[in-house]
Amino acid sequence: MKKQIFFTLILLISGLARADLVIEIDKGSRAAIPVAVVPFANESGQPLAEDIGQIFTEDLKRSGDIEPLDRTKMVSIPSKAEEIYFRDWGLLGQRYLLVGGVQYDAPSQVYKVRYELYNVQSQQRVIGKIISGKSEKLRDMGHAIADAVYEAVTGIRGVFSTRIAYVTLEKSGAKNIYRLEVADADGRRSTELLKRSMPIISPAWSPDGKKLAYVSFESQRPAIYVQDVDTGTRTQVTSFKGLNSAPTWSPDGTKLAVTLSKDGNAELYVLDLRNNSLKRLTNHWAIDTEASWSPDGRTIAFTSDRGGGPQIYLVDASGGSPRRLTFEGRYNSRPRFSVDGKKVYYVHQRDGSFNVASLDLESGQDQILTQTEMDESPSVAPNGSMIIYATQKNGKGVLAVVGVNSGSKYTLPAQFGDVREPAWSPYISR
């Protein structure tokens, strides 16, 4: 990969078409917990607008930490406690059993979904709840059930109700159409936020999940915008001469770390959104870019070629002398802190391939997490269990997800063209 690819702030993204992303599971986890997810009983008396059982089953399988039992292997289809023969499920090697049913109230047009999770060995109910909503909320309810089951089984909060942002490009002859889109974490229900004929790059979620910062070249030069995801209202926050790129939010949502070349060289700055004041963090002849705030807001990781090639450095958010973090290999870029701040994820070049890697900040131990070859733009799920990134598959740009601990893998290709620049949202109240 040529050196200019390191400068993702000026990268022109290759193309794709607007559509929901389609999940392709590449590899499961051998250590996944077996859970029998029984098809919910349709007690509504009419066809459901969505197969809610399929929604949360696919969510759980995609996590890599839970392995739902194949429906064809189920010996019965219980929907409530008195219909369960726990011995049968134990013989099938299942540790948990999820049952439930769906009712529909025609006058109010509201669905009521009942679910219960049981420990097969103890035969005790672990969780149980009734949730309700209209037909357009069935997918949300499915994701909510997956979140609840995942947390009950693993002890980790689920991320199935979160969202992802990404950039697509539709090519039609010599014409390019770039789109900034937001979808559910499973790639469904995509929504177009911005459509332009010039590149859009570097989307970044605000900590409350209500806004996206990004770079648009729509005025023939890069400028940084902040856009409200729900209303579409947007504000241009920087448009200096030269580069305006790589925005990333501070944990409290009041600042953006950005890369600007307004003074002649690409340096890191902190923009205070409350008063539009700028503070310069770096001052070096090299290119400093791709900042990432630590969860406590005290440290910023960034990419710099001040050592002769792209490497990861750390600098105090209040300023000071940067210190080099990566030494293994000639190319390390696009750092992202783990949720607990103990690791940094980044793109590492080894044996001609560009892979997502992790570096333990205490031990200094690094680990390659992916086996694809042209990985870019890692973004961490808010529970820290998965990383979404951009890569190539069969000559197309796709999004891919890898389980940090489970090693599970799946891809999210667009139905047409390419997709790039993923950003996983924080937890969102909806």
Curated annotation (Swiss-Prot):
Signal peptide: 1-19
Gene Ontology cellular component list: periplasmic space
Alphabetical UniProt keywords: Cell cycle, Cell division, Periplasm, Signal
Domain of life, per lineage: Bacteria
GO biological process: cell division; protein import
Main location group: periplasm
SUPFAM superfamilies the record matches: TolB, N-terminal domain (SSF52964), Tricorn protease N-terminal domain (SSF69304)
UniProt cross-references to InterPro entries, sorted A to Z: 6-blade_b-propeller_TolB-like, PD40, Tol-Pal_TolB, TolB_N
Subcellular localization, as worded in the UniProt entry: Periplasm
Pfam families linked: PD40 (PF07676), TolB_N (PF04052)
Family: Belongs to the TolB family.
HAMAP family: TolB
Protein role: Part of the Tol-Pal system, which plays a role in outer membrane invagination during cell division and is important for maintaining outer membrane integrity.
Description of how the protein assembles with itself and partners: The Tol-Pal system is composed of five core proteins: the inner membrane proteins TolA, TolQ and TolR, the periplasmic protein TolB and the outer membrane protein Pal. They form a network linking the inner and outer membranes and the peptidoglycan layer.
Name of the protein described by the UniProt record: Tol-Pal system protein TolB
Record organism: Hahella chejuensis (strain KCTC 2396)
Gene encoding the protein: tolB
